[in-house]
A protein has these predicted regions:
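N-terminal export signals
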Residues: 1-20
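All-alpha RGS (Regulator of G-protein Signaling) helical domain and cognate RGS-like helical scaffolds
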Residues: 7, 21-247
Length: 247
C-alpha cells in the first residue's frame, strides 16, 4: 500500500511538472514571421475629399464609356453628356478643397469600387446593349454620389466643410431626382394630401416624397442582356467603406 501510494505521488509530481511546461499556443509547422500590426488609418477631411473625387471620376468615366454613351438614344445622349460635364466640373471644385485641407488632389476612379461593381456595370452594358438601361443607370449612379456625400457629412470634422458636403450632396440629389423623372415622369412617387373624402386634393398642399430623404442602403440597378427563364443581372452599388477611402 505504501509502495502504491509512493508511486502515485511520484506520478503526480511528473504530471504536474509536465503540465507546467505545456505550450498553449497554436500548433504550427516551420518558422512563421512576426506580423506587424496594421497601422490605424486616419479618415481625415482631405481623405474624404479625395475619395469624393474618386467617386465623381468613376461616375464620369462610366457614363462616358462607349458601352453606355454608345447605346444611348439621341435624347439620353445629350442628358448623359451634361451629367458627365457636371461631374468633370465638380472635380475642379473638389481639387481646390483637397488642397485647402492639406491633401493632394486625386483625379482617378476609385479602384476598389470599380472592382466591386463598376467593372460589372460596364461589362453588362456592353453585353446588353440596351438603350433603355442608360437612364436607369444614370439615376443609380447619381443616387450613389448623393449617398456618398450624405455619408461623408457625418465623418467630416471641419464644420464649414461639413456644410459644403451637404451642398454637394443636395446637388447630386437634385440630379438624381431629374434622372428619376426622365425614367418615369409624373408624381406617382409623391405623397399627396387629401380632404377627408380621401379623393380631393387638399387646397394649397405641397406634394412630398413619402419615404425618408437620403437612404444610405446600396443602390440597385438591373442591367445586361435578357436571359431565358431567368431575371436579368441586378447590380448593387454601395458607398465607399474604410477599405475604399483614398487615404
Amino acid at each position: 500500500m505504501l509502495r502504491t501510494s509512493g508511486a502515485l505521488v511520484a506520478g503526480s509530481a511528473v504530471l504536474a511538472a509536465c503540465a507546467g511546461s505545456v505550450d498553449t499556443g497554436i500548433a504550427r509547422i516551420g518558422e512563421a514571421p512576426e506580423l506587424d500590426p496594421l497601422a490605424e488609418a486616419e479618415v481625415s477631411d482631405a481623405a474624404l475629399l479625395r475619395t469624393a473625387m474618386s467617386v465623381e471620376k468613376m461616375v464620369a468615366n462610366i457614363l462616358s464609356d462607349s458601352s453606355v454613351s454608345g447605346v444611348a438614344d439621341a435624347a439620353a445622349k445629350t442628358i448623359v453628356a451634361a451629367y458627365v460635364a457636371a461631374h468633370t466640373a465638380r472635380l475642379t471644385a473638389l481639387s481646390a478643397l483637397v488642397t485647402a485641407n492639406g491633401g493632394q488632389p486625386y483625379n482617378e476612379p476609385n479602384e476598389k469600387l470599380m472592382v466591386a461593381y463598376g467593372d460589372s456595370v460596364l461589362k453588362l452594358m456592353g453585353e446588353g446593349k440596351k438603350a433603355s438601361d442608360v437612364l436607369p443607370l444614370t439615376h443609380a449612379l447619381e443616387s450613389l454620389v448623393a449617398a456618398t456625400y450624405q455619408y461623408f457629412v457625418a465623418l467630416t470634422t471641419n464644420s464649414a466643410l461639413r456644410a459644403e458636403m451637404m451642398r454637394l450632396g443636395a446637388q447630386a440629389s437634385r440630379r438624381a431626382a431629374v434622372a428619376a423623372q426622365l425614367v418615369s415622369s409624373g408624381i406617382k412617387a409623391f405623397g399627396m394630401q387629401y380632404e377627408e373624402d380621401g379623393t380631393t386634393q387638399l387646397e394649397g398642399s405641397v406634394p412630398t416624397f413619402a419615404g425618408a430623404f437620403g437612404p444610405l442602403n446600396a443602390v440597385q440597378v438591373t442591367l445586361g442582356p435578357d436571359v431565358v427563364d431567368a431575371p436579368r443581372a441586378n447590380v448593387l452599388m454601395d458607398t465607399p467603406s474604410l477599405n475604399s477611402i483614398i487615404y
